[in-house]
């Protein structure tokens, strides 16, 4: 794994968060390098600068290295991005007092003079971000977006024109391009949220724009809902909760239990909380945590059931280290006799990991694509 970042005379040591031993993963990509090169070569750095979707702080660390006094407005939906950026600033002895933090639902201040962004995988979320920027940016403000060249096409440029202003793409460099968009100064109204029903479980679900499975139940969640464990549980964790559908169903099945919803996405946690209220579940029994797995979950919380539908990507990177961390956290936090109940694609072979960690693993249900596994501490 490469950790030495060197671009345009800027030298940094950058790590992913949480740390990964996978040799093909690093804390930045060529699009980060292209953005920084374009910015410096253009000689038109303007502050305050908003930095959006900066995976682990490569962009904010680079600008802080150039001038530690530049005010930066850092917006992220991922808790791991916040923690990784903080860690990399400390590691490189960079100040933090020039950073102002915003979640993906916060409104950036209207003093922003320049925006640096990475293109997220979820284009519905990206359109939402452009619309929010249209509400605060003056006409003529530049927005620079770094992305893989293969992700940039006429439809994406039309998305800019529709939601923020005219845009054009640079020449390719290391298979990336930088899109330059000029704000037209016309505020766009944000769309209403998506709401849909799961009648067989008497649930109504709403999703914010960066939450997986925007308007339907994904196949993994479907098989999981049909095969939740029977019994009495006092403390249940929906780990990687997304819109919270597993935890909501758990609240119906185990009405006396406290249900803890945890996700790396702030929008996911907000969606789960809204869904708890919308489905009129017991007040005081739902608890919501924006966290990197169970890293900061209070130590007095000892679950006897952890439900988990693990992701197998972090941003653009395909990886199983998040699932591995989830399983490790579950083993660490479950009370003795507690159960980890997961769903995953069959080809991911999660049974091998669970057998290694828990010394036991039972197949609860399966179909052609998915398998539900259970391990007991």
UniProtKB/Swiss-Prot annotation:
Cellular location of this protein?
Cytoplasm
In terms of SUPFAM superfamilies, this protein maps to: S-adenosyl-L-methionine-dependent methyltransferases (SSF53335)
Q: What InterPro entries does the annotation carry?
A: DNA_methylase_N6_adenine_CS, rRNA_m2G-MeTrfase_RlmG, RsmC/RlmG, SAM-dependent_MTases_sf, Small_mtfrase_dom
Q: Which Gene3D superfamilies match?
A: Vaccinia Virus protein VP39
One GO cellular component assignment for this chain's record is:
cytoplasm
Q: Which GO terms describe its molecular function?
A: 23S rRNA (guanine(1835)-N(2))-methyltransferase activity; nucleic acid binding; rRNA (guanine-N2-)-methyltransferase activity
Primary residence: cytoplasm
Keyword set for this entry?
Answer: Cytoplasm, Methyltransferase, rRNA processing, S-adenosyl-L-methionine, Transferase
Q: Where are the transmembrane segments?
A: none
In short, the EC number is 2.1.1.174
Q: Which Pfam families match?
A: MTS
**Reactions mediated catalytically:** guanosine(1835) in 23S rRNA + S-adenosyl-L-methionine = N(2)-methylguanosine(1835) in 23S rRNA + S-adenosyl-L-homocysteine + H(+)
Q: Which GO terms describe its biological process?
A: rRNA base methylation
Q: What does this protein do?
A: Specifically methylates the guanine in position 1835 (m2G1835) of 23S rRNA.
**Similarity remark:** Belongs to the methyltransferase superfamily. RlmG family.
**UniProt name for this protein:** Ribosomal RNA large subunit methyltransferase G
């Amino acid at each position: 794994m490469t950790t030495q970042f060197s671009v345009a005379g800027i030298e940094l040591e950058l790590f992913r968060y949480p740390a990964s031993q996978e040799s093909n993963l690093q804390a930045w990509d060529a699009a980060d390098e292209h953005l920084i090169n374009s910015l410096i070569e253009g000689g038109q750095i303007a502050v305050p600068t908003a930095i959006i979707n900066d995976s682990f702080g490569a962009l904010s660390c680079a600008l802080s290295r150039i001038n530690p006094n530049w005010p930066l407005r850092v917006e992220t939906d991922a808790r791991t991005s916040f923690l990784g950026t903080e860690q990399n600033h400390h590691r490189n002895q960079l100040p933090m007092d020039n950073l102002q933090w915003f979640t993906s639902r916060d409104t950036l201040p209207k003093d922003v003079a320049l925006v640096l962004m990475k293109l997220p995988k979820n284009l519905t979320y990206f359109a939402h971000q452009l619309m929010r920027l249209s509400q605060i940016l003056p006409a003529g403000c530049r927005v620079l977006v770094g992305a893989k060249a293969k992700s940039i096409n006429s439809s994406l440029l039309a998305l800019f024109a529709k939601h923020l202003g005219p845009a054009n793409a640079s020449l390719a460099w290391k298979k990336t391009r930088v899109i330059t968009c000029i704000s037209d100064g016309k505020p766009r109204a944000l769309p209403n949220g998506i709401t849909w029903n799961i009648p067989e479980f008497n649930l109504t679900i709403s999703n914010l724009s960066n939450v997986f499975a925007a308007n339907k139940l994904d196949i993994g969640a479907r098989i999981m809902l049909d095969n939740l464990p029977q019994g009495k549980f006092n403390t249940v964790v929906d780990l990687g909760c997304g819109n919270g559908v597993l935890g909501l169903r758990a609240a119906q099945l185990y009405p006396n239990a406290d249900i803890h919803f945890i996700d790396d996405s702030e929008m996911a946690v907000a969606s789960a909380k809204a869904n708890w209220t919308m489905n009129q579940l017991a007040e005081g029994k739902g608890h919501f945590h924006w966290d990197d797995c169970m890293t900061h979950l209070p130590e007095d919380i000892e679950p006897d059931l952890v439900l988990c539908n693990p992701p197998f990507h972090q941003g653009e990177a395909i990886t199983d280290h998040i699932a591995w961390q989830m399983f490790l956290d579950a083993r660490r936090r479950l009370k003795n006799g507690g159960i980890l109940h997961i769903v995953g694609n069959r080809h991911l072979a999660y049974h091998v990991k669970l057998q290694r960690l828990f010394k036991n693993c039972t197949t609860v249900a399966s179909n052609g694509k998915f398998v539900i596994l259970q391990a007991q501490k």
